[in-house]
From Swiss-Prot:
GO terms for biological process: negative regulation of translation; translation. This is Large ribosomal subunit protein uL13. Belongs to the universal ribosomal protein uL13 family. Residues 126-146 are annotated as: Disordered. One of its GO terms (molecular function) is structural constituent of ribosome. It comes from Roseiflexus castenholzii (strain DSM 13941 / HLO8). Part of the 50S ribosomal subunit. PROSITE patterns: RIBOSOMAL_L13 (PS00783). CDD domains: Ribosomal_L13. It comes from the Bacteria. The gene is rplM.
Length: 146
């Protein structure tokens, strides 16, 4: 029996919608990264973009455990002298709630062109509404802890 190797033209993509209300950031991000990469499919191939589209709603209601909402920091630099910026999780979730989840998922995907293509299939919305009803997304229930 020959080993099956999936081709890019044979990929079947589904659309999933995930409600982030009261979900822990890291645990939800790992499940989203798995869906985006296609690792949940028996036809997974690390060099083919075989993942599904993921829509996340209620990103503003995502949570962290412990004291991390006050202590977790996000850093960036403008490459100019004195251009170092730091913002806490609490400040970032207040201004741009979708960026928190995008940063977490981005760190779990490959740092290549393939990873950027997979991240483009992630659609995050702060509130409960999304404009992707025409794609008929399936409701994805994140795995329970334990």
């Amino acid at each position: 029996m020959k080993t099956y190797a999936q081709k890019a033209s044979e990929v079947q993509r589904d659309w999933y919608v995930i409600d982030a209300t009261n979900q822990t950031l890291g645990r939800l991000a790992t499940q989203i990264a798995t869906l985006l990469r296609g690792k949940h499919k028996p036809t997974f191939s690390p060099y083919i973009d075989g993942g599904d589209f993921v829509i996340v709603v209620n990103a503003e209601r995502i949570r962290l455990t412990g004291r991390k909402p006050e202590q977790k920091m996000y850093y960036r630099h403008s490459n100019y002298p004195g251009g170092f910026k730091a913002v806490s999780f609490k400040q970032l979730i207040a201004r741009h709630p979708e960026r928190v989840l995008r940063f977490a998922v981005k760190g779990m995907l490959p740092k290549t062109r393939l990873g950027r293509r997979q991240l483009a299939k992630l659609k995050i919305y702060a509130g409960p509404k999304h404009p992707h009803a025409a794609q008929q997304p399936k409701v994805y229930e994140p795995r329970p802890r334990g």
